Amino acid sequence: MADVEIYQSGSLTIAKAGGQQIAACQIQGNARALFKAAIDAVPSGGSLNIGKGRYVFSAPYAFPLDPDGSNLFYCSIPIIDKGMHITGAGVGQTILQLAPGQRREGRHVALMLVRGKRGFDLGYSSFGLRGITFEGASSQQNLSEQPYDGEGLLLVGSQRSNGIFENLEFRNSHAAGMYLGNNGSGPGTNETVRNVIARNCAAEGIMLDTNKGSSVSDCQAWGCRVGLFLNGNDDWQKRGSDNVTATRIKTDSQITCWQVNDFSLSQIEMDCSKAASSYGFVVRDGNGTIKNSVLKSDPTKASSYGGATYFYEQARVLLEACQIEGYFGVHAVGKSYAEAKDCNITAPGGCFCTTDPNPVQSTIIAQGCTCSGLKKALQSGSTFEER
């Protein structure tokens, strides 16, 4: 039995701790005070079970993310300075929903916020979140302002370790679905994201920002600005290995690896053919591999928006045994380095491409690949070698 339970009975939502009722509210009412009382009652390292039902929240709790008291966010469910394990009745069964009108210009919102109290305080050493749908009701929010960094349905911050996020759904977000961030305090280590679905998120469906030794598996993202975003930091050249993996991912949106060292992707199914402004599989700086994957975009879009890949700055990428289809296939610009082994590439604009409006010093090495369409579109200053 969980330490604290939340459930719906008759017309009421009820919270109990140790078998004793600690809070109640109308099912049709605002659940934010009841959930805060329930979370406060969970002991450190304890458990909270949320029963079947729809729970609707305002976002009244103001929380500054930066140490100087700036970067103010508003949230519905604050989980501060506490490691715990939260379990719902399952995706589509337990639904946590943002009430209408919570997000508006200048008012940045996260439905659930998990982190240390002050700017650089340590976060949890163990945390679990399972079996819940997060509903952002974005059609009932003010979307006049572009998504702000960190906004979303779940925002996790602070230097922390051993978080597990599985069997979750994030839908209709005004910004990100789930955002495992850091707010400058350091990485999340040994984080696991498994069996998560993101739908119709205005920013990233699934974001891992400055993570180490972490994994994403068996996840999907549909109708998001970016399906999966693995983010690093400007110190990538001296940071060492991040060791972040992603496998068995399905998405119709761009996938981005940004200043991440030692990323490893496999069994990716990315088809951006219907995305309005996708660059396909994008890598900036850092290094890593993608294997046994399908990377597709719209070959009729005669620009980088139709490209299956886009590697720039000082990215170093190995593609192995991938099916690549788009206007451009392997597209490497800036000072990037791309090596393609045993790939099947279809690209009318160039299976191997280094063209860019800016000067390039990029390199593409091809080995054992097949090409349908234009084989090479090379810009002066770049290098192409076939082995």
Map each language-model feature to its residues.
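Extracellular beta-strand-rich solenoid/capping regions of secreted or surface-exposed proteins
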Residues: D40, F57-T87, L96-R130, S138-R160, ...
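Acidic glycine-/aspartate-rich tracts in secreted/extracellular proteins
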Residues: G53-R54, G90-Q93
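Acidic Gly/Asp/Thr-rich repetitive segments characteristic of extracellular carbohydrate-active
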Residues: K16-G51, V56-F57
